Amino acid sequence: MTLANIKSAKKRAVQSEKSRQHNASQRSMMRTYIKKVYAAVAAGEKAAAQAAFVEMQKVVDRMASKGLIHANKAANHKSKLVAQIKKLA
């Protein structure tokens, strides 16, 4: 239910809700990939961390290119995680 009375405003409300749900799903998926890298680093598994990082990098870059997150946030995630992976023996 929306408060909109004008037809175009009602349509925009429906579209906004649909995109909000889609974006929430995409953000959740991105966070899951990031957590996988952190988990591998915490376990000390360098090979697993590197493999998870490659997958995470694809997802984060795609989210940044679509405007879901800022490009700088994507860069911060990647640089922080690659530094932690390099610290592993």
Curated annotation (Swiss-Prot):
One GO CC annotation: small ribosomal subunit
UniProt protein name: Small ribosomal subunit protein bS20
Job of this protein: Binds directly to 16S ribosomal RNA.
Keyword annotations from UniProtKB, A to Z: Ribonucleoprotein, Ribosomal protein, RNA-binding, rRNA-binding
Any one Gene Ontology molecular-function term assigned to this protein's record: small ribosomal subunit rRNA binding
Family to which the UniProt record says this protein belongs: Belongs to the bacterial ribosomal protein bS20 family.
Region (Disordered): 1-28
